[in-house]
Amino acid sequence: MLFACSSSRVQTGNTNDTQYSEINSDSLYALRVSFFSIGSGIDRKTRQDYDRFIKEFEQKNNVSILLDKATWGKEGEIDYCIKLNNLSTELQEQFIRSTKDKIKDSKLVRLYENTTCKYKI
């Protein structure tokens, strides 16, 4: 196991071929909200509700959510890659809790925390 201060190492490839790629802490996102499809498109209602939630959160708290959108797939699949380091700890926790609450009923949305933006170009 390898450790580094500003980046982490991730093993790629098979176990016989040891190759490592660097993940810089700047490329990590607090959240990745992934709207995916299993043959009939994404959950558009949940996406619209989540877009509305982000705008309302920004207005209510006078902040900007740092959001990168990465599209992938052929049925509208999209990842919302969100950095929250410009928010106070309290607002970060509130945003994460609210995000979990907004997407909890959808079977076509996944949430990842402290991760990279998989499809970002």
Predicted regions and their residues:
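Immediate post-signal-peptide N-terminus of mature secreted/exported proteins
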Residues: 10-44
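Short edge beta-strands and adjacent turn/loop segments
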Residues: 20-29, 64-75
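Helix N-cap motif at beta-to-alpha junctions
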Residues: 39-40, 85-91
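Surface-exposed aromatic
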Residues: 71-85
